Amino acid sequence: MTNSSEKQWERIQQLEKEHVEVYRELLITLDRLYLIRKHNHAVILSHTQQRLLEIRHQLQINLEKTALLIRLLEKPDNTNVLFTKLQNLLEESNSLDYELLQSLGAQSSLHKQLIESRAERDELMSKLIELSSKFPKPTIPPDDSDTAGKQVEVEKENETIQELMIALQIHSGYTNISYTI
């Protein structure tokens, strides 16, 4: 490129940046004006809403640029360096848009698959709850400490009964007493 065409290109880039910035500010101001008129007061946007507005502004700016490029492409001049660069930028933008469309399609199918999996899981959970309600509640096995305590109690009762029997035998005068029962 010659020196003058480089200067032209730099000037075009500078003007384009200024145009994009002014247009972005215009869109932001128009959005705020619309929200104020609609709600009769200033609206405070959350971070997510602010980000969505910025994306919308970017899309509007890109649409405006694309429209200008299409108008320029309708009058092709193959010797024009600007035409060639703009055509390359438009092709690159189209390829990026296609990649974005592909990734959004993949994300959409994964999201759909996730929703279907969640629905299947919920259905299986409801079936499991229904089936589990048909079975009796499990009985709680007795604690080992309870059985050990009952065993000690039974042994004490046995000793007491044995002592009572011996006392009865002595009291009744039975002579053939066996002290071990």
From Swiss-Prot:
The keyword Nucleus applies. GO terms for biological process: attachment of spindle microtubules to kinetochore; cell division; chromosome segregation; establishment of mitotic sister chromatid cohesion; meiotic cell cycle. Residues 112-171 form a coiled coil. Keywords: Cell cycle, Cell division, Centromere, Chromosome, Coiled coil, Kinetochore, Meiosis, Mitosis, Nucleus. One of its GO terms (cellular component) is nucleus. Signal peptide: none annotated. InterPro entries: MCM16. The keyword Nucleus applies. Its main location: nucleus. Transmembrane segments: none annotated. It is found in: Nucleus; Chromosome, Centromere, Kinetochore. Component of the kinetochore, a multiprotein complex that assembles on centromeric DNA and attaches chromosomes to spindle microtubules, mediating chromosome segregation and sister chromatid segregation during meiosis and mitosis. Component of the inner kinetochore constitutive centromere-associated network (CCAN), which serves as a structural platform for outer kinetochore assembly. Belongs to the CENP-H/MCM16 family. Present with 279 molecules/cell in log phase SD medium. Component of the heterotrimeric kinetochore subcomplex CTF3, which consists of CTF3, MCM16 and MCM22. The CTF3 subcomplex is part of a larger constitutive centromere-associated network (CCAN) (also known as central kinetochore CTF19 complex in yeast), which is composed of at least AME1, CHL4, CNN1, CTF3, CTF19, IML3, MCM16, MCM21, MCM22, MHF1, MHF2, MIF2, NKP1, NKP2, OKP1 and WIP1. Interacts with CTF19. This is Inner kinetochore subunit MCM16. The lineage of its organism: Eukaryota, Fungi, Dikarya, Ascomycota, Saccharomycotina.
